[in-house]
Amino acid sequence: MQAQTFSHLHSQSSQRTTEVTLYLTIPESYRQEPIVTQLVSRYQLQVNILAATLGTNGGQGQFKLTLIGHAQAINNALAYLEQLQVTIVLDQESDGW
């Protein structure tokens, strides 16, 4: 999913705290990488894991997460995930605030 899907986060102050709930599908090639941890350490986000599915013998990982932090930090984190070719789907119940 492209970053413009999350453009509503750009329209407010980058220092305003916001939250967004989304679904991630992480490719198998990143199975051993600390991708969710990077969202906390690199982007100073609070991450709430609402659901997760990982295959026991490999495969992709699927997560439902709530990200809480400054709008700019969330956008930067989403750009990082897109660089990794993680599939991002915004939860339609989430309004980003």
Curated annotation (Swiss-Prot):
Cystine crosslinks: none
InterPro entries: ACT-like_dom_sf (IPR045865), NIL_domain (IPR018449)
SUPFAM superfamilies, per database record: ACT-like (SSF55021)
Protein's job: May have a regulatory function.
Name under which the protein is recorded: Uncharacterized protein ssr2439
Species assigned in the record: Synechocystis sp. (strain ATCC 27184 / PCC 6803 / Kazusa)
Taxonomic lineage from the root: Bacteria, Bacillati, Cyanobacteriota, Cyanophyceae, Synechococcales
